[in-house]
């Protein structure tokens, strides 16, 4: 059977990234409390395409993804990237996974449990020299009270919900929970999925006792 893809290309154009994008696939990720957690990720997988190739082997992306699906972890990302380069005859490889991650949180006073979902991402790349770059990212909902409005007002201050995106470049494993807690501890108050009246009182008083402007910088200072 004639294989057009494997025939040489004479246009002499190298393409930085070819592959698949936004493929939804079930994965298993590490969970600090329970050991592991099942979720569904939106996945991007790319490799470079040499100037003399017409195209890459698209089916191999999904084949490799299916093999790694039972245990996707930060520790394995480097091996996955090198495996992509090997099986697709590429010099560089890129892998991105974005998924909802669930953590059970208890309300601060009533201790009523509920699940919070956080958007998490893991991104990795391997260049032609074999240098690995790994980034873990979390998006954390928070509550903030404005210290400026509190200063100029006789009563109260304006408050708002927001999202803090924290990205960490790493070489050793890091828990998603640690990154999330780092952000929540830097906010005026963190967010809960379940609140009773006693909890509403608690989070309101805590937020207004802890007005914050620059939550992102506060998170960085706490990490350092």
Task: Label every PLM stretch briefly.
Residues 1-223:
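N-terminal intrinsically disordered, cationic/polar leader segments
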């Amino acid at each position: 059977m004639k294989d057009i893809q494997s025939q040489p290309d004479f246009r002499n154009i190298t393409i930085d990234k070819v592959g698949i994008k936004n493929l939804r696939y079930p994965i298993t990720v590490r969970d600090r409390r329970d050991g592991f957690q099942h979720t569904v990720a939106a996945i991007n997988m790319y490799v470079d395409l040499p100037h003399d190739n017409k195209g890459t082997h698209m089916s191999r992306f999904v084949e490799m993804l299916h093999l790694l699906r039972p245990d996707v972890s930060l520790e394995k990302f480097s091996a996955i990237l090198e495996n992509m380069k090997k099986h697709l005859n590429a010099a560089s490889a890129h892998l991105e996974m974005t998924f909802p991650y669930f953590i059970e949180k208890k309300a601060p006073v009533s201790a009523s449990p509920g699940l919070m979902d956080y958007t998490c991402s893991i991104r990795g790349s391997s260049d032609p020299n074999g240098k690995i770059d790994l980034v873990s990212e979390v998006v954390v909902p928070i509550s903030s009270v404005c210290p400026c409005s509190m200063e100029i007002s006789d009563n109260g201050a304006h408050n708002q919900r927001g999202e803090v995106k924290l990205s960490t470049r790493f070489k050793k494993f890091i828990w998603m929970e640690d990154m999330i807690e780092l952000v929540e501890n830097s906010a005026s108050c963190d967010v809960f999925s379940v609140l009773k009246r006693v909890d509403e009182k608690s989070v309101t008083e805590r937020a207004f006792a802890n007005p914050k402007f620059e939550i992102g910088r506060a998170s960085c200072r706490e990490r350092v």
